[in-house]
């Protein structure tokens, strides 16, 4: 079960692992859903009480390794809401314990106006060690979809196009 004390990103529902292991094939619409924790920052102290929903797409290889993209919900009550993109990138790199690099795009202009701002995050796994750790995390944390995630995930999954800022090989239509 997900607990309040968990800190590392936790993936909770898998539809397909194939896109994560076959980096030479463009994303074909299959995805893995789950949640990721983004800790809040109050002065220098971390308050680990914020879960956010995420969609991870297996994509083509980037020059730096296997590449994944994710949408993360950022509520307006969270400290990073509305921050400069570069500041967010630096903050996440320092405080969020994930393997690989993180890059933020501008908010994705979510169509439903009452939904929180969403950011696109790219994971660049640079070695088999990171990839294996990532897959192990997925395989050991598969759970039923959590309450409240489905509607948001379905809304984001309907988006037809976006440009991934972290991989030059992508085009606007890689992710469908």
Give the location of each predicted region.
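The −1 position to Zn-ligating cysteines in a subset of zinc-ribbon hairpins
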Residues: 163, 176
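Polybasic, proline/glycine-rich intrinsically disordered low-complexity segments
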Residues: 41-46, 51, 79-161
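Cys/His-rich microdomains that often coordinate metals
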Residues: 171-172
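Charged, compositionally biased non-catalytic regions
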Residues: 1-35
């Amino acid at each position: 079960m997900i607990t309040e004390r968990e800190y590392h990103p936790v993936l909770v529902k898998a539809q397909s692992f194939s896109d994560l292991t076959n980096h030479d094939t463009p994303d074909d619409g299959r995805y893995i859903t789950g949640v990721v924790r983004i800790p809040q920052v109050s002065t220098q102290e971390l308050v680990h009480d914020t879960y956010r929903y995420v969609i991870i797409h297996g994509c083509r290889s980037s020059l730096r390794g296997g590449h994944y993209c994710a949408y993360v919900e950022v509520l307006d009550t969270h400290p990073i809401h509305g921050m400069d993109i570069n500041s967010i990138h630096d903050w996440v790199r320092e405080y969020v314990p994930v393997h690989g690099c993180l890059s933020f795009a501008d908010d994705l202009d979510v169509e439903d106006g009452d939904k929180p701002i969403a950011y696109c995050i790219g994971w660049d796994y640079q070695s088999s060690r990171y990839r294996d750790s990532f897959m192990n995390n997925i395989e050991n944390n598969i759970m039923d979809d959590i309450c409240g995630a489905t509607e948001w995930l379905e809304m984001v999954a309907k988006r037809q196009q976006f440009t991934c800022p972290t991989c030059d090989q992508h085009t606007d239509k890689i992710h469908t």
